[in-house]
């Protein structure tokens, strides 16, 4: 296991106590990465927050909504 995931889990638990199912682990990792860069003297940037993923997995939706592994470049560009 990678070090530091306990810290992320702790942060997520504390945030979910205030605003459940709003902030994702991806949000926390992104903000932590940005803040680490700033702490080391690097640039800052705005991080858009808010859960945009689902709170449960749906294989049928994933198979129909996500591009396939063999999609062409034009198909990938059109999907996004």
UniProtKB/Swiss-Prot annotation:
Where is the region Disordered? 56-80
**Positions annotated as glycosylated:** 70
User: Pfam families attached here?
Assistant: peroxidase (PF00141)
SUPFAM superfamilies, per this entry? Heme-dependent peroxidases
Q: Which cofactors go with this protein?
A: Ca(2+); heme b
Is the keyword Iron assigned to this protein? yes
Q: PROSITE patterns of this UniProt entry? A: PEROXIDASE_4
EC number(s) on file: 1.11.1.7
Catalytic reaction list:
2 a phenolic donor + H2O2 = 2 a phenolic radical donor + 2 H2O
What does the UniProt function comment say about this protein? Removal of H(2)O(2), oxidation of toxic reductants, biosynthesis and degradation of lignin, suberization, auxin catabolism, response to environmental stresses such as wounding, pathogen attack and oxidative stress. These functions might be dependent on each isozyme/isoform in each plant tissue.
Q: Which family does it belong to?
A: Belongs to the peroxidase family. Classical plant (class III) peroxidase subfamily.
Record-given protein name:
Peroxidase
